[in-house]
Amino acid sequence: MLDPNLLRTEPDAVAEKLARRGFKLDVDKLRALEERRKVLQVQTENLQAERNSRSKSIGQAKARGEDIEPLRLEVNKLGEQLDAAKSELETLLAEIRDIALAIPNIPHDDVPVGRDENDNVEVSRWGTPRQFDFEVRDHVTLGEMHGGLDFAAAVKLTGSRFVVMKGQLARLHRALAQFMLDLHTEQHGYSENYVPYLVNQDTLYGTGQLPKFAGDLFHTRPLEEEADSSNYALIPTAEVPLTNLVRDEIIDEDDLPIKMTAHTPCFRSEAGSYGRDTRGLIRMHQFDKVEMVQIVRPEDSMVALEEMTGHAEKVLQLLGLPYRKVALCTGDMGFSACKTYDLEVWVPAQNTYREISSCSNVWDFQARRMQARCRSKSDKKTRLVHTLNGSGLAVGRTLVALMENYQQADGRIEIPEILRPYMRGLEYIG
């Protein structure tokens, strides 16, 4: 959520910056609502003061033995007017809040301006895509060759965009997640967390999934109950529970940064992606991801973004997977982000780079929703923290890249040396 004071005092400047990301802010409506809020605020305060004064007069008149009925009727009328004004003010404030919750974050000044993914800017590349001297198989074909990816079984169990992994490929999938966690906790300074996969509405509001993206979530409720705000939703990313661990907290600045990681399944309805990536593991309703979250002082967040992106890059480098780093343009960034880097790994069967990590500085956008603050030891003043999140990495897509980049002419899949301790020394699958 943006700073309400900024929306009140500089709506035109905010609108100009939001326009860079293709969002049209209705400044006239905001101004009209703000003017009405001011009127109702003054009216409510005046009515409250008048009723208090008249109520005091009743006691004084009663002490003098005077007829208090006219004063009592007047106080009752003032009370009715006050209740009506309060009700209108509450309705108006709710409308303003709903508008504010639907406004995306302001892009950082150094984010490239653009409409969509075609306007993203490549920052760097690492590694050289392998030149194969045989016909490249995609990960689905390889998975079926080794009996490790069973999409038909998943359709029987659940439906499309799910998979059953078996045998050595299931083990490799687990090994990747363990390797990522070990790297982030032992070398990058993150603390490992195990978090709920179901979260409540407040948690989803805190990180920005609600109210705007309710349709992207899988919601749960007991069959005998009606859907309501007490129902849970499956997490779309571990960013949601990890970041909300600091909701309504005041953290000593000396305790920052807080760096957390977790390996979880992620659940997404993939609304709006019908027909895209229907084959294989690229776009699933359920997929595993190792997530990184940092809670930092405001002045440290831009440096933290570079650091976090480097942590995700390190995973790819140690696995020997070619990738490129891309700065997302204003029109392609996520709702809550003020600056984002995507890492795209080389997928040989598609002859292109595909997203495998997204690392974002969210500034104070989520912190304001969560009321997550830090306190300076010197002056004891509090201020909102900055939050960052990044994939470190998407495990299924890493498996795809590894299978395709390390495939052999006979269909075997070489295990990168760094993963072999997690695979009991296994060098090849197949």
From Swiss-Prot:
One of its GO terms (molecular function) is serine-tRNA ligase activity. It is an enzyme of class 6 (ligase). Keywords: Aminoacyl-tRNA synthetase, ATP-binding, Cytoplasm, Ligase, Nucleotide-binding, Protein biosynthesis. GO terms for biological process: selenocysteine biosynthetic process; seryl-tRNA aminoacylation. The keyword Protein biosynthesis applies. Consists of two distinct domains, a catalytic core and a N-terminal extension that is involved in tRNA binding. PANTHER family: SERINE--TRNA LIGASE, SERYL-TRNA SYNTHETASE. It is found in: Cytoplasm. It comes from Klebsiella pneumoniae (strain 342). It catalyses: tRNA(Ser) + L-serine + ATP = L-seryl-tRNA(Ser) + AMP + diphosphate + H(+); tRNA(Sec) + L-serine + ATP = L-seryl-tRNA(Sec) + AMP + diphosphate + H(+). SUPFAM superfamilies: Class II aaRS and biotin synthetases, tRNA-binding arm. L-serine binds at T237, A238, E239, E291, S391. Homodimer. The tRNA molecule binds across the dimer. ATP binds at R268, S269, E270, E355, I356, S357, S358. This is Serine--tRNA ligase.
